[in-house]
Curated annotation (Swiss-Prot):
Leading EC class: translocase
GO process annotations (BP): aerobic respiration; electron transport coupled proton transport
Positions that bind [4Fe-4S] cluster: C68, C69, C134, C163
Protein name stated in the entry: NADH-quinone oxidoreductase subunit B
Sorted UniProt keywords: 4Fe-4S, Cell inner membrane, Cell membrane, Iron, Iron-sulfur, Membrane, Metal-binding, NAD, Quinone, Translocase, Transport, Ubiquinone
Cofactor: [4Fe-4S] cluster
GO cellular component assignments: plasma membrane; respiratory chain complex I
UniProt source species: Pseudomonas putida (strain ATCC 47054 / DSM 6125 / CFBP 8728 / NCIMB 11950 / KT2440)
General function of this protein: NDH-1 shuttles electrons from NADH, via FMN and iron-sulfur (Fe-S) centers, to quinones in the respiratory chain. The immediate electron acceptor for the enzyme in this species is believed to be ubiquinone. Couples the redox reaction to proton translocation (for every two electrons transferred, four hydrogen ions are translocated across the cytoplasmic membrane), and thus conserves the redox energy in a proton gradient.
E.C. number(s) listed in UniProt: 7.1.1.-
Topology class, membrane: Peripheral membrane protein
PANTHER family referenced in this protein's UniProt entry, alphabetically: NADH DEHYDROGENASE, NADH DEHYDROGENASE [UBIQUINONE] IRON-SULFUR PROTEIN 7, MITOCHONDRIAL
Length: 225
């Protein structure tokens, strides 16, 4: 093997590294290595995305039910539906250990202060899913003893329609809640309080899928599956 030795001439021009000709030198290989090994940006943005990812994929529900919709909610925990796919299979019996509560069923006036007290015992961040027509708007019980919608006394994040909704509808509501949590901007500590919290605007699904419903031309009869 033969080698050729070349003497370095410091006065020779160098197009890649011109000394004294340009203030900055462009080296694509060097830039690639810098971007691979050095983070350029705000640490707050990275932490926010990581925290939101952990929150939305580890939602612990509070275990309580009000009426028949609770039966459909518990069906989502069985093997055919497998709510564990979304990280929400850890049912908690204490509101202090739960991340979200599902108002499943008819909310009577005498139960409203109890539900509100349970909600206040939950730690931030916390969310609420209203499941079923009775929880959403009172349903067919337009009487003095039924609250006409749990949003009269609780901040509801997701509404699941139906009487009662199927387990698939509850799972879709859970996915919508995960999507909303992924876009939230809130302080990393619950001690800070409610200031500075940004929640993404979630439009109604009937508005988002309006064109899709209009495009349907083949409507099956009610007795077909």
């Amino acid at each position: 093997m033969q080698y050729n030795l070349t003497r370095i001439d410091p006065d020779a021009p160098n197009e890649q590294y011109p000394v004294g000709e340009r203030e900055t030198v462009t080296d694509q290989l060097l830039e690639d290595q810098v971007h691979k090994n050095i983070f350029m940006g705000k640490l707050e943005d990275v932490l926010r995305g990581a925290v939101n990812w952990g929150r939305k994929n580890s939602l612990w529900p509070y275990n309580f039910g009000l009426s028949c919709c609770y039966v459909e909610m518990t069906t989502a925990f069985t093997a055919p539906h497998d709510i564990a796919r979304f990280g929400a299979e850890v049912i908690r019996a204490s509101p202090r250990q739960a991340d979200f509560m599902v108002i499943a069923g008819t909310c009577f006036v005498k139960m409203a202060p109890i539900i509100q007290r349970l909600y206040e015992q939950m730690l931030e961040p916390k969310w609420v899913i209203s499941m079923g027509s009775c929880a959403n708007s009172g349903g067919m019980y337009d009487i003095y003893s039924v609250v006409q919608g749990v949003d009269k006394f609780l901040p509801v994040d997701v509404y699941v329609p139906g009487c009662p909704p199927r387990p698939e509808a509850f799972l879709q509501g859970l996915m919508l809640l995960q999507e909303s949590i992924g876009q939230e901007r809130r302080p990393l500590s619950w001690v800070v309080g409610d200031q500075g919290i940004y929640r993404a605007e979630m439009p109604a699904q009937k508005d988002l899928r309006r064109e899709q419903r209009i495009a349907v031309t083949n409507l099956r009869s009610p007795d077909e599956v």
